[in-house]
Amino acid sequence: ANERPPGSCSSSGCRRCCRPGPYHSHLAVLKAEQAAVFKFPLAPLGCSGLGSALLAAGPGMPGPAGASHLPLELQLRGKLEAAGSGEPGSKAKKGRRSRTVFTELQLMGLEKRFEKQKYLSTPDRIDLAESLGLSQLQVKTWYQNRRMKWKKIVLQGGGLESPTKPKGRPKKNSIPSSEQLSEQERAKETEKPPESPGEPSERQQEE
């Protein structure tokens, strides 16, 4: 009567042998934590810093050591991408040249000044640029283009108007030629009173 089949135990004995000890409770906690970790949704490895850090670490390498290389790689990759994207932009900026758009008032001022003066000296160009709110280079470029257009019109129309020279350069008439000098000398000689043939000269009177 005292013999019990294997696997059967009394209530008190079962409580003693089946009661979980501290070791068993620790294992249960670890299993619960592992289950919670695996149930937690992970982002794709290629899209998250954690995944790339895990890939960089690899088996046999600690996580922090592998993750220390991650910022450097990302930094280098970012610099390369920025340099690659910046080169075409810089080339495009160098290739493009902005065209100056003049206002109606500026064009009117330039045209009026061009009618009076086809060539501008440096002081005149500075004054005109400041009065119209333009740079000297813009005024100079506009004048060059306008003169070319004006010369074509003059040549095609057979006009008698000739291009005037700038104020800074000496005009052709301001420098006397050799013929003009000889004419001036002749004019001076004619101003002297002519000697009459009947009157003796000063040398003859002295003799």
Curated annotation (Swiss-Prot):
Set out the biological process GO terms recorded for this chain's protein.
Answer: regulation of transcription by RNA polymerase II
Question: Quick check: keyword Membrane in the entry?
Answer: no
* Molecular functions (GO terms): DNA-binding transcription factor activity, RNA polymerase II-specific; RNA polymerase II transcription regulatory region sequence-specific DNA binding
Q: State if Oxidoreductase is listed as a keyword.
A: no
Could you tell me in which tissues this protein is expressed? Answer: Expressed predominantly in the facial primordia, developing stomach, and proximal limbs.
Residue segments, region Disordered: 157-207
SMART domains assigned? HOX
Question: What Gene3D superfamilies is this protein classified in?
Answer: Homeodomain-like
One Pfam match = Homeodomain
Q: Where is the composition biased (Basic and acidic residues)?
A: 183-207
Q: Which InterPro entries is this protein grouped with?
A: HD, HD_metazoa, Homeobox_CS, Homeobox_TF, Homeodomain-like_sf, HTH_motif
For this record, the Gene Ontology CC terms, alphabetical, are: nucleus
- Annotated DNA-binding ranges come to 95-154
| Signal peptide boundaries | none
Keywords of this protein's UniProt record, alphabetized?
A: DNA-binding, Homeobox, Nucleus, Transcription, Transcription regulation
Q: Where in the cell is it found?
A: Nucleus
Family, per entry: Belongs to the BAR homeobox family.
Described purpose of this protein according to its UniProt entry? Transcription factor, which is involved in craniofacial development, in odontogenic region definition, and in stomach organogenesis. Binds to a regulatory module of the NCAM promoter.
The protein's name in its UniProt record: Homeobox protein BarH-like 1
Source organism: Gallus gallus (Chicken)
